[in-house]
Amino acid sequence: KPSGCGEQNMINFYPNVL
């Protein structure tokens, strides 16, 4: 699974999407 995309989205707030 892509790390940062779905993992801990509450904490990272989608760093890869932003």
Curated annotation (Swiss-Prot):
Its main location: secreted. There is a cross-link at residues 5-8 (Isoglutamyl cysteine thioester (Cys-Gln)). Keywords: Bait region, Disulfide bond, Protease inhibitor, Secreted, Serine protease inhibitor, Thioester bond. It is found in: Secreted. Signal peptide: none annotated. GO terms for molecular function: serine-type endopeptidase inhibitor activity. Coiled coil: none annotated. Belongs to the protease inhibitor I39 (alpha-2-macroglobulin) family. Is able to inhibit all four classes of proteinases by a unique 'trapping' mechanism. This protein has a peptide stretch, called the 'bait region' which contains specific cleavage sites for different proteinases. When a proteinase cleaves the bait region, a conformational change is induced in the protein which traps the proteinase. The entrapped enzyme remains active against low molecular weight substrates (activity against high molecular weight substrates is greatly reduced). Homodimer; disulfide-linked. This is Alpha-2-macroglobulin homolog.
